[in-house]
């Protein structure tokens, strides 16, 4: 198991949820914090601690987003019309790495970023190698022709029982899909309950 994989599973245990719904996640068998005092359930979390944990869960779910990037996305969401929390999740889900992951082109958000940065993904017929690229409704995402037989891609798209969320479409035969619309919070299939309101409160202080 690589250092990154160990680190991400440790994050699930530290934050008390399975962050990606992965069957290999150590949280499934050891649902307590790592470390000497991990099983101690008597530790009381402060109000600030609850807000911070809510933020960390969502931030970790989207992979290696820095705190600066995460806060900047929130700042942009605040300036948009409508509900800040909904805007925030909509912006996070509109990122290219999020959509490649949601389309099941990549098995994890981490491998999604890697496929993009290595030039295996195209948007509207052009190579797209920036994971944070914000997609617009109607954008077409496809796997570069020369990359379509890659083992990680073939294994991911061929998994039985997989479905895509309603805000994307994906055709397994053509290995291409479309970003249909900006999702609401309830549209996103988080493996935990996202307490977005706590993140809004934290960043609005």
From Swiss-Prot:
<dbReference type="GO" id="GO:0015935">
    <property type="term" value="C:small ribosomal subunit"/>
</dbReference>
<comment type="function">
    <text>With S5 and S12 plays an important role in translational accuracy.</text>
</comment>
<feature type="domain" description="S4 RNA-binding">
    <location>
        <begin position="94"/>
        <end position="172"/>
    </location>
</feature>
<dbReference type="Pfam" id="PF00163">
    <property type="entry name" value="Ribosomal_S4"/>
</dbReference>
<dbReference type="InterPro" id="IPR001912">
    <property type="entry name" value="Ribosomal_uS4_N"/>
</dbReference>
<comment type="function">
    <text>One of the primary rRNA binding proteins, it binds directly to 16S rRNA where it nucleates assembly of the body of the 30S subunit.</text>
</comment>
<dbReference type="InterPro" id="IPR036986">
    <property type="entry name" value="S4_RNA-bd_sf"/>
</dbReference>
<dbReference type="GO" id="GO:0042274">
    <property type="term" value="P:ribosomal small subunit biogenesis"/>
</dbReference>
<keyword id="KW-0689">Ribosomal protein</keyword>
<protein>
    <recommendedName>
        <fullName>Small ribosomal subunit protein uS4</fullName>
    </recommendedName>
</protein>
<dbReference type="GO" id="GO:0003735">
    <property type="term" value="F:structural constituent of ribosome"/>
</dbReference>
<comment type="subunit">
    <text>Part of the 30S ribosomal subunit. Contacts protein S5. The interaction surface between S4 and S5 is involved in control of translational fidelity.</text>
</comment>
<keyword id="KW-0687">Ribonucleoprotein</keyword>
<dbReference type="InterPro" id="IPR018079">
    <property type="entry name" value="Ribosomal_uS4_CS"/>
</dbReference>
<dbReference type="InterPro" id="IPR022801">
    <property type="entry name" value="Ribosomal_uS4"/>
</dbReference>
<comment type="similarity">
    <text>Belongs to the universal ribosomal protein uS4 family.</text>
</comment>
<keyword id="KW-0699">rRNA-binding</keyword>
<keyword id="KW-0694">RNA-binding</keyword>
<dbReference type="Pfam" id="PF01479">
    <property type="entry name" value="S4"/>
</dbReference>
<dbReference type="GO" id="GO:0006412">
    <property type="term" value="P:translation"/>
</dbReference>
<dbReference type="InterPro" id="IPR002942">
    <property type="entry name" value="S4_RNA-bd"/>
</dbReference>
<dbReference type="InterPro" id="IPR005709">
    <property type="entry name" value="Ribosomal_uS4_bac-type"/>
</dbReference>
<dbReference type="GO" id="GO:0019843">
    <property type="term" value="F:rRNA binding"/>
</dbReference>
């Amino acid at each position: 198991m690589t250092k990154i994989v160990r680190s991400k599973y440790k994050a699930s245990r530290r934050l008390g949820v399975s962050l990606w719904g992965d069957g290999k996640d150590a949280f499934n068998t050891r649902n307590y914090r790592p470390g000497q005092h991990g099983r101690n359930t008597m530790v009381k979390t402060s109000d600030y601690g609850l807000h911070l944990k809510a933020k960390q869960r969502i931030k970790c779910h989207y992979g290696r987003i820095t705190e600066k990037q995460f806060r900047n996305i929130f700042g942009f969401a605040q300036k948009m019309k409508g509900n800040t929390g909904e805007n925030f999740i909509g912006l996070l889900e509109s990122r290219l790495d999020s959509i490649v992951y949601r389309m099941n082109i990549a098995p994890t958000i981490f491998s999604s970023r890697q496929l993009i940065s290595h030039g295996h993904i195209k948007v509207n017929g052009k190579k797209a190698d920036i994971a944070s690229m914000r997609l617009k409704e109607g954008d077409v995402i496809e796997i570069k022709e020369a990359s379509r037989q890659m083992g990680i891609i073939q294994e991911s798209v061929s998994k039985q029982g997989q479905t895509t969320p309603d805000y994307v479409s994906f055709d397994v035969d053509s290995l291409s899909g479309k970003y249909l619309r900006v999702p609401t919070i309830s549209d996103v299939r988080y493996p935990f309950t996202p307490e977005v309101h706590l993140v809004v409160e934290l960043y609005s202080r």
